[in-house]
């Protein structure tokens, strides 16, 4: 009887985690990139400390690999959070101006003077103002 009760409680816990979509809070699902750096030795200029839950309603999965310099410009649809796993050895900085409530769901404006000290990345964006 006790074994059936234990199996029942474990099944309820599994269903609750599946329905609620929350993880265990172990930061990036065990990739080893703890708060303040990714552990690969080249992330001194890219300090991020966040432990947000992954999106549960809308999910976009991309398995692209980028090598070399990458500069992103323009308006990007963005709903809530992003879940990124793996080693990300990055340098540079960026700014996000998140707007909502006016019908625009996305990064609505890129800011040039964000105070992050990058001063220009030289990535050849053509003056888009993203760096």
Curated annotation (Swiss-Prot):
One annotated GO molecular function: structural constituent of egg chorion
GO CC terms in record: egg chorion
Region span, Central domain: 47-110
Entry's Gene Ontology BP terms: chorion-containing eggshell formation
Keywords, ordered alphabetically: Repeat, Signal
Superkingdom of origin: Eukaryota
Stretches for region Right arm (Gly-rich tandem repeats): 111-131
Region (Left arm): 22-46
UniProt cross-references to Pfam families, sorted A to Z: Chorion_1
Signal sequence segment: 1-21
Protein function: This protein is one of many from the eggshell of the silk moth.
Family recorded in the similarity comment: Belongs to the chorion protein family.
Name of protein: Chorion class high-cysteine HCB protein 12
Species per Swiss-Prot/TrEMBL record: Bombyx mori
């Amino acid at each position: 009887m006790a074994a059936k009760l234990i199996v029942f409680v474990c099944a309820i816990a599994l269903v609750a985690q599946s329905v609620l979509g929350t993880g265990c809070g172990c930061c990036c699902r065990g990739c080893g990139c703890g708060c303040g750096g990714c552990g690969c030795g080249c992330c001194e200029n890219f300090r991020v400390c966040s432990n947000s839950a992954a999106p549960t309603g809308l999910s976009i999965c991309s398995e692209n690999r980028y090598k070399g310099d990458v500069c992103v410009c323009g308006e990007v649809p963005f709903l809530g959070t992003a879940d990124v796993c793996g080693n990300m050895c990055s340098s540079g900085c960026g700014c996000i101006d998140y707007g909502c409530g006016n019908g625009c769901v996305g990064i609505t404006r890129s800011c040039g003077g964000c105070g992050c000290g990058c001063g220009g990345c030289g990535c050849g964006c053509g003056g888009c103002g993203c760096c």
